[in-house]
Amino acid sequence: RVLGNAQFRKEMLELNVPSGIYSMIAGIDLVCVGEDEWYVLEDNLRVPSGVSYMLENRKMMMRLFPDLFSAHRIAPVAHYPDLLLETLRQGAPDAQEDPTVVVLTPGLYNSAYFEHAFLAQQMGVELVEGKDLIVEDDTVYMQTTHGKKRVDVIYRRIDDDYLDPEVFNADSMLGVRGLMRAYRAGRVTLANAVGTGVADDKSIYPYVPDMIRFYLGQEPILHNVPTHICSEADSLSYVLDNLEKL
């Protein structure tokens, strides 16, 4: 299922991801089915999106319903950008003390551009497009009014296919030519890593609990929504016998 997945990237074979971290940001969709009973509906590890709307929604709720927040123990979320920046900085290659972090956006016309700009502003980092970055000697640089500045961590909001025209879609005008060379050389960190979209796939989703047990030796804290893979005989038989209930 992994090798046949459209998001599987053979370009990542034998590539040592900086700091060994593939997914720094995960967007996990949850559904509540009862009191204190939550299920994981979906895993989003490729280019998770939507957190800015949650942050803005919370600000509005606090202004409109202050009594609600004073009467209940509602966990704060305003510090999310600080946690995000700290996470990105910790993933920098070469153990640099003051790494340069940027947010890479497809541009103004992308549907999530507001979030890209919002997070960059909240973290105090540069919002860049592919044309703002260049690769020289397997190192990524940002072109500024003061000259070139090395980039250590890229929080990329661009899909794999458009990241590097040397490696993926040759017609891409959104990515950075040579980015994968710098990535393979361990000179830049991409968040999230190329190929993490495999984990988004619904054919992988049913096996996540088994992955947790195998790799962590633990029982999953949250349940998965029951999912049937019809390429497996037992699941197919169950689905055919219970179509009216599904």
At which residue positions do the language-model features occur?
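Domain-scale recognition of functional cores that engage charged ligands
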Residues: 1-246
